[in-house]
A protein has these predicted regions:
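Positively charged n-region of N-terminal signal peptides that target proteins for export
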Residues: 1-4
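C-terminal motif of bacterial Sec signal peptides marking the signal peptidase cleavage site
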Residues: 12-14
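Lipid interaction determinants
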Residues: 17-80, 95-154, 162-163, 167, ...
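Beta-strand/loop nucleic-acid-binding surfaces
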Residues: 166-186
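Short nucleic-acid-contacting surface segments enriched for D/E, G, S/T with interspersed K/R
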Residues: 180-199
Length: 232
């Protein structure tokens, strides 16, 4: 099933909202002084859905300006979108593999979904269109699928995740130990980069090279290497 993201296309009342309100002709872009450091974090709430009782939406804005959106459709499936986020005044823009979505930052704790043109949505049905900051760490319901350029040199492994545009150190869960043997079999020279399809989660771990803590991508399921393929 095609991911239903851009989120505004999920909300049938938003896509078809015809309420005559003068504010609809103005964008929601107003300077507020928000910055990357005080916006990054986890936001969560249940949003309405056109063809299901609702969807539990969890948005993880990582400090490196990448994001993970988890949409758990009630009674159905869980899907993920990954990408980059940017901030212009009080407008949060998500550019993911499934399209672009925008939110208005109302305050430190609340962001509100905007329409496809970046305007406030005026909903006569009083459905909730906001996500609330959640101070608990992001824990995905399922392993997150990623694709990117993987390389290894001894015990040091890294991946450039295409959708996020960032490099992350890699660790292998016990269920993914076969990945290293598959990599050694597929490469033609030491540390050769290969396009990889993986599933896993992000986790803060001690660095292998120094005393700092780094954001690792922990592989839970190795799917495949695709020699010759590059990030689009």
């Amino acid at each position: 099933m095609k991911h239903l993201f851009v989120l505004t296309c999920l909300l049938f009342f938003a896509c078809n909202n015809k309420k005559n309100n003068n504010n609809n002709n103005r964008t929601a872009n107003q300077p507020t002084g928000f910055g990357t450091k005080n916006v990054a974090g986890v936001f969560y709430d249940t949003l309405p859905c056109a063809d299901c009782p609702g969807m539990a939406a969890k948005l993880y804005l990582k400090p490196d300006n990448s994001f993970i959106m988890e949409l758990a459709y009630i009674g159905k499936n869980v899907v993920y979108d990954l990408g980059k986020w940017s901030l212009t005044d009080s407008i949060l823009k998500l550019t993911g593999t499934e399209g672009i979505s925008q939110f208005k930052i109302l305050n430190h704790a609340t962001i509100k979904l905007l329409d496809n043109e970046g305007r406030m949505i005026y909903d006569t049905t009083n459905r909730r269109l906001t996500l609330q900051r959640n101070n608990t760490p992001f824990q995905p319901l399922q392993p997150v699928p990623v694709e990117g350029i993987f390389s290894a040199d001894g015990n040091t492994m890294n991946i450039l995740i295409c959708a996020m545009g960032n490099n992350y150190p890699v660790a292998l869960a016990p269920s993914a130990m076969s990945m290293k043997a598959a990599y050694n079999k597929a490469i033609h020279k030491k540390s050769e980069p290969l396009y990889a399809k993986l599933k896993g989660h992000f986790e803060l771990r001690p660095s292998l090279n120094d005393t700092t803590t780094k954001d690792f991508f922990v592989v839970e399921h190795f799917m495949a290497f695709v020699p010759g393929q590059q990030c689009k």
